[in-house]
From Swiss-Prot:
Organismal lineage: Bacteria, Pseudomonadati, Pseudomonadota, Alphaproteobacteria, Rickettsiales
Name of the gene this protein is made from: serS
Cellular-component GO terms for this entry: cytoplasm
Single GO biological process annotation from the record: selenocysteine biosynthetic process
Pfam families in alphabetical order: Seryl_tRNA_N (PF02403), tRNA-synt_2b (PF00587)
Protein name as annotated: Serine--tRNA ligase
Organism field: Rickettsia conorii (strain ATCC VR-613 / Malish 7)
């Protein structure tokens, strides 16, 4: 959620930043709604003060009867009625909060202006792409290996699901353990095993609700399946005041993730790129406003390390204003090279959300010896999605005979297996 005080004091800049997100100017409407709310709040405070004064006089009167006493009682009763009506008006005046809840985060000054991914800015590349490399797509390879099943899985769950078997299931498990080990041992992230069913308020805190309600799966009893472990991890500091010396807090978690893929009809309908259920290792950092820019680079580098150790070519893109996520003020996308598609595809998003999520979930910190609190900054990064990483390994490590060479760093995690070959039932 955006800071209403900042909007109040920076109307023109607010409208300019909204325009960068391709949203029409809204400062005038917000000013009107904010003015109405502040007027009601001011009246409530005045009546509360008047009630306090009159109640004190009543309490100090020697005689608890007579015209003066009864007149003061009538005044207090009238004030209570006014207060009840005003407080009801304030509770019913939800339009301002509803409007603020629909605004995305304000883009950082470094974010390039643009409508879509074509305007994203290249930051750096890693590794060499080979235009003459073998170029079967991952699903062709997986099906030929008899270790990736879409057809039978569709009978169980429908489209956009997959069943992995044998050594591909083992590769999935190896990747999870490898990624967690790297992030905990080399990058100082603390491992968490969080719930994957969360309440709506947790989704709201992370910026998933109300705007993206249709993109998640809701149960019939008030829970939602998480679209990313970011939801569970950032909420670990909801409604808390953290001592400054404990920051930064860095969490890593592996979870299954669930997305309805609303609006993705016709996109990536084959294979494992876009599934309703997928596994992902997620990184979350909680830090101070002064350190969040450096922490953004840190968490991005942690994600990159996985691809570097797997020797997979990739590039880092700075997303433009029109391509950023709702809660982000600045995002790097990491895109891995897929020979089967002959293009880079997103494998990780690394975002600095500033105090956007913290304001929603009331997550603050304070210096030692101080009573003043400040909103924390939250950051998140994929570290990485297991399925898409497996896609990249299959396509970049494929051999002429359809077998898959295991990357060196995974051989121990695979129990010494160096190559995945076709499974014969």
């Amino acid at each position: 959620m955006l800071n209403i005080k900042w909007i109040r004091e920076n109307k023109e800049l607010f409208d300019e930043k909204l325009s960068q997100r391709f949203i029409e100017p809204m400062s005038s409407k917000i000013a009107m709604l904010d003015g109405e709310k502040r007027k009601i709040t001011s009246l409530i405070q005045e009546f509360q003060h008047a009630r306090k004064v009159k109640s004190k006089i009543l309490g100090n009167m020697a005689s608890k009867s007579g015209e003066e006493f009864e007149g003061l009682q009538r005044d207090v009763k009238h004030i209570n009625e006014k207060l009840e009506a005003l407080e009801q008006d304030l509770n019913n005046n939800n339009e301002l909060n509803e409007l603020l809840n629909m605004f995305p985060n304000i883009p950082d000054d470094e974010v390039p202006y643009g409508m879509d991914e074509s305007m994203n800015k290249l930051v750096r590349t890693y590794g060499e792409t080979n235009p003459n490399a073998l170029n079967k797509q991952h699903f062709e390879l997986g099906i030929k290996l008899n270790l990736m099943d879409f057809e039978q899985t569709a009978k169980i769950s429908g489209t956009r699901f997959v069943t992995l078997k044998g050594d591909l299931a083992k590769l999935e498990r190896a990747l999870i353990n490898f990624m967690i080990d790297v992030h905990t041992k080399e990058w100082d992230f603390f491992e968490i095993s969080p719930p994957v069913l969360v309440r709506d308020n947790a989704m709201y805190n992370a910026g998933q609700l109300p705007k993206f309600a249709e993109e998640s799966f809701a149960t019939t009893n008030g829970y939602r399946l998480i679209p990313t472990a970011e939801v569970s991890l950032v909420n670990m500091v909801a409604d808390t005041i953290i001592p400054r010396e404990k920051l930064p807090i860095r969490y890593v978690a592996y979870t299954p993730c669930f997305r309805s893929e609303a609006g993705s009809s016709g996109r990536d309908t084959r294979g494992m790129i876009r599934l309703h259920q997928f596994g992902k290792v997620e990184l979350v950092s909680i830090t101070t406003p002064e350190e969040s820019t450096n922490e953004h680079e840190y968490i991005t580098n942690a994600s990159e390390t996985i691809l570097q150790k797997l020797n997979l070519p990739y590039r880092v893109m700075l997303l433009c204003t029109g391509d950023m996520g709702f809660a982000a003020k600045k995002t790097y996308d990491i895109e891995v090279w897929l020979p089967g598609q002959k293009q880079y595809r997103e494998i990780a998003s690394c975002s600095n959300c500033g105090d956007f999520q913290a304001r929603r979930m009331k997550a603050r910190y304070k210096e030692f010896g101080s009573n003043e609190t400040t909103l924390v900054h939250t950051l998140n990064a994929s570290g990485l999605p297991i399925g898409r990483t497996m896609v990249a390994i299959l396509e970049n490590y494929q051999n002429e005979d359809g077998s898959i060479t295991i990357p060196d760093v995974l051989i121990n995690y695979m129990g010494g297996l160096q190559k995945i070959i076709a499974y014969s039932e």
